[in-house]
């Protein structure tokens, strides 16, 4: 089985499906936040197919860097200006965030920044996390 290198191609929010800015949307983590630097999940709304959407903590560097320096710098730059870097990797949407792990606060903030980027009304997005112990 060959391993393809990640692409992390940046995506313009205006190129995303319109329903992301029009419906009540829930982001659901598939396995919780303690899964490392990439948390897989999906955005869902009634009447629409789920859209795969992962959270990627871009600063993890062991045993090898998660992303090239240019991607890391861009993610930090966008975050510093109150936005989230939206990217694509092999057909999955990514919200690229600073840090080496995704915690609850970062997950909530990343989804809120996505909602603003697509013009969603305040309060129309929710985050569903499992409690694992």
Question: Where are each of the predicted segments found?
Answer:
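Charge-rich, low-complexity N-terminal segments
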Residues: 1-44, 87-88
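Short, charged, intrinsically disordered terminal tails
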Residues: 3-6, 80-81, 119-133
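Short, well-structured hydrophobic secondary-structure segments
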Residues: 35-61
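Short, Lys/Arg-enriched charge-dense amphipathic segments
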Residues: 48-54, 102-117
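Short, internal acidic amphipathic alpha-helical interface segments
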Residues: 53-94, 98, 106-107
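Conserved short hydrophobic interaction patches
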Residues: 73-77, 110-121
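Well-ordered alpha/beta subsegment
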Residues: 91-112, 123-133
């Amino acid at each position: 089985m060959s391993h393809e290198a990640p692409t992390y191609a940046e995506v313009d929010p205006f190129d995303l499906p319109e329903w992301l800015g029009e419906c009540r949307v829930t982001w659901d983590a598939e396995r919780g936040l303690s899964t490392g630097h990439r948390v897989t999940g999906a955005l869902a709304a009634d009447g629409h197919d789920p859209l795969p959407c992962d959270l990627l903590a871009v600063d993890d560097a062991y045993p090898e860097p998660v992303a090239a320096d240019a991607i890391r710098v861009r993610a930090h730059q966008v975050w510093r200006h109150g936005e989230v870097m939206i990217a694509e990797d092999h057909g999955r949407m990514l919200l690229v965030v600073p840090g080496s792990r995704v915690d609850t606060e970062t997950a909530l903030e990343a989804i809120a920044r996505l909602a603003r980027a697509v013009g969603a009304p305040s309060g129309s997005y929710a985050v569903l996390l499992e409690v694992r112990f």
